[in-house]
């Protein structure tokens, strides 16, 4: 690991975190459901699936691009800790059904969107 690679992850991660801050601020909650977090996790999952789909289907994506976009940007954009805290808060507030919906929506949507991005990268 060299300093240039660390800088790529740092800049990509910072950019992703700023995008997350903006996007989750635009749609923070809808009837106690944390839409903003679902949006950023879904977008990051799709982008990461697309990036690795491009690589799988033969596009030569440089290590630097993978570090900046995959590890950095997508890592900074997505937020497992916020998802976990919001789910915990919903449970604490007695919103059990909403908490369960949040868990299923985040897990199923993000896995599906990685798959979709991967498949769409082939075209």
Curated annotation (Swiss-Prot):
Any one Gene Ontology BP term: cellular detoxification of fluoride
Principal subcellular localisation of the protein: membrane
InterPro entries: FluC
GO cellular component: plasma membrane
Transmembrane segments: 6-26, 38-58, 68-88, 100-120
Pfam family, one: CRCB
Membrane-related topology note: Multi-pass membrane protein
Keyword Nucleotide-binding in annotation: no
PANTHER family documented for this protein: FLUORIDE EXPORT PROTEIN 1-RELATED
This protein's name: Fluoride-specific ion channel FluC
Organism: Pyrococcus furiosus (strain ATCC 43587 / DSM 3638 / JCM 8422 / Vc1)
Lineage: Archaea, Methanobacteriati, Methanobacteriota, Thermococci, Thermococcales
Gene: fluC
